[in-house]
Amino acid sequence: MTEQKRKLEKLTGVKGMNDILPQDAGLWEFFEATVKSLLRAYGYQNIRTPIVEHTQLFTRGIGEVTDIVEKEMYSFVDALNGENLTLRPENTAAVVRAAIEHNMLYDGPKRLWYLGPMFRHERPQRGRYRQFHQVGVEALGFAGPDADAEIIMMCQRLWDDLGLTGIKLEINSLGLAEERAAHRVELIKYLEQHVDKLDDDAQRRLYTNPLRVLDTKNPALQEIVRNAPQLIDFLGDVSRAHFDGLQRLLKANNLPFTINPRLVRGLDYYNLTVFEWVTDKLGAQGTVAAGGRYDPLIEQLGGKPTAACGWAMGVERILELLKEEHLVPEQEGVDVYVVHQGDAAREQAFIVAERLRDTGLDVILHCSADGAGASFKSQMKRADASGAAFAVILGEDEVANGTVSVKPLRGTGAEGEKNVQQSVPVESLTEFLINAMVATAEDGDD
């Protein structure tokens, strides 16, 4: 292939890392606005961390024998200074790092939230991408089951706000470290009795992370998993009281749940409460939100021992659900499209457009695609395609008379007429348009 031909090749994005195009951006903005409103209602503050962190943050925080660290991280050596860096595969460890580094907990607990892209090197499929987006909350400095219950109830309120149904809550307790250690011994003994039936993945995890074997999706292993020792049977009094307290709070708030003793999560920092929100509408990728308590993590990353809990949810999966349930909001067009022809009209059109924007209206000013003036007919086609409610038209006659012509594109005019073009003095234009929009809205309500 010649150098010249190589330069002419069409470049494409990285597989599994998707563009968010204008026709989809409205749905993202709707979701983001809904989430931000919810989080404000619960008193959470936004935190934004870099997408690149030191690799050690994740090996220490997530765990070296987890799938994420072993197989899924985008890691590289910085050519400038030799540092080992990683594109963040999740954000809890980064938020905790920031809280420790900036001494954020010196004056008490913090409620934090984030929204942004994460990266995992895995096979792209529906609901699972190499670059994906998560929104999450971290409640730092809260030890009781009330914090667990509140962050779970936040999710339910979000589903209600979005209009989503059929998302079910599963909960479990991973207990404390000594309880997991006792369960680990018995679990390994049990799995060793069936080692010849375990698949390669389960055999690999048998001595490094046996708890994850319980989370296998392999149909051939389900009977073995069903009969395995359950961690919930190893809970001591403190863990049991915490788990019972959570259940009481959920029941008191009429939030249904299922106890799933096989729910273990894929990150090493969890203890006590873990939970997932699952649906059967997304195929194999049924988890849309997950979280729990991670009391050891802050100390593990160099801070003082501090209780904490949180959750993260995959934005792309929730947007898939919104599409699946036909809950995609209709994208609104701009208020006004300004059409003009002639040099004097073009200059006046700029002035009119800016004045309308000063009043809070959304305005598109026609700009020629080729540097030449377009006909009124072609401009009106663009005005209609833009989704604008009204076209404001300026030609030589309008400039000479100090007027504009206004044509409704989506409903009635100020006097109730449908699609009737009217001449309006420039100084009265804003008032006219506002009245016309009110009339259009009322017509739509009828």
Curated annotation (Swiss-Prot):
Reaction(s) catalysed by this chain, per the record, are:
tRNA(His) + L-histidine + ATP = L-histidyl-tRNA(His) + AMP + diphosphate + H(+)
GO MF entries: ATP binding; histidine-tRNA ligase activity
Q: Does the keyword Protein biosynthesis apply?
A: yes
Broadest EC class assigned to this enzyme? ligase
Q: Which GO terms describe its cellular component?
A: cytoplasm
Instruction: List, alphabetically, the InterPro entries matched.
Output: aa-tRNA-synth_II, aa-tRNA-synth_II/BPL/LPL, Anticodon-bd, Anticodon-bd_dom_sf, His-tRNA-ligase, HisRS-like_core, HisRS/HisZ, HisRS_anticodon
Alphabetical list of PANTHER family matching this protein: HISTIDINE--TRNA LIGASE, MITOCHONDRIAL-RELATED (PTHR43707:SF1), HISTIDYL-TRNA SYNTHETASE (PTHR43707)
Q: Which family does it belong to?
A: Belongs to the class-II aminoacyl-tRNA synthetase family.
- The name under which this protein is listed is Histidine--tRNA ligase
What organism is the protein native to? Burkholderia pseudomallei (strain 668)
